[in-house]
């Protein structure tokens, strides 16, 4: 996670801003075996998702799941992928646009970003963009 202490981007007296981070669970970058492997490894390594003890789960994940599931998952993702990319990311960007439009009618100095728990853009990248 990024550190925001001593942030050189902050300028004293520049006025207050409010940041809004729109988050979601996440999506792979593309519907390919390699992208799904990266995404599934991140997602399925989270102890809040898989509560099996790490000593038991790690060999299953790395020995079986990540060698079989990405190709199957890529096929499923390809069936829902659009020209705009991931449906989840596309709809999240659309929601952000509508939220931004609504809020900017009433308030100023609001900055917006998207962050995903798994995949890109990550929550820490979203926070950095604020």
Each predicted region: which residue ranges?
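Active-site-proximal alpha-helix that buttresses catalytic centers in soluble enzyme cores
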Residues: 2-130
